[in-house]
């Protein structure tokens, strides 16, 4: 059984294609299950992820693919999140709309700082040693 539970689409800014594109490829490659799991939007942080305004269309696009291709492949609704305690209530609400959540570790804070750093943009020795 071939499965993939970690996929992204154009909304994150570092992948291409829409949900249906990924579903078609998965079917052609013989996958039985596919999780659509783009980077979750979060309040006040927009780097490498969809915008909050895109979330509704993202979920709708997955639901449409589930209806259209459900007889060929099992499609799951998911998001990849960065965890920060102050976003817990937001994530609790998101979980109600999803089949699962992936924890990604692409963003972090340095103790004593309020700023969120992206792991993709680490360029100072003190960040690496933190």
Please report, for each region that a protein language model flagged, where it lies by residue.
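Acidic-and-aromatic substrate-binding clefts and catalytic sites of carbohydrate-active enzymes
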Residues: 11-17, 82-87
């Amino acid at each position: 059984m071939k499965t993939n539970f970690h996929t992204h689409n154009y909304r994150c800014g570092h992948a291409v294609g829409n949900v249906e594109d990924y579903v078609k490829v998965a079917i052609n490659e013989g996958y039985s299950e596919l999780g659509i799991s783009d980077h979750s939007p979060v309040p006040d942080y927009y780097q490498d992820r969809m915008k909050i305004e895109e979330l509704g269309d993202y979920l709708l696009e997955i639901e449409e693919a589930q209806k259209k291709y459900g007889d060929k492949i099992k499609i799951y609704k998911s998001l990849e999140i960065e965890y920060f305690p102050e976003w817990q209530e937001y994530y609790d609400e998101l979980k109600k709309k999803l089949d699962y959540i992936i924890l990604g570790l692409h963003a972090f804070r340095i103790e004593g700082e309020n700023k969120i750093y992206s792991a993709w943009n680490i360029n100072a020795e003190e960040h690496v040693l933190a």
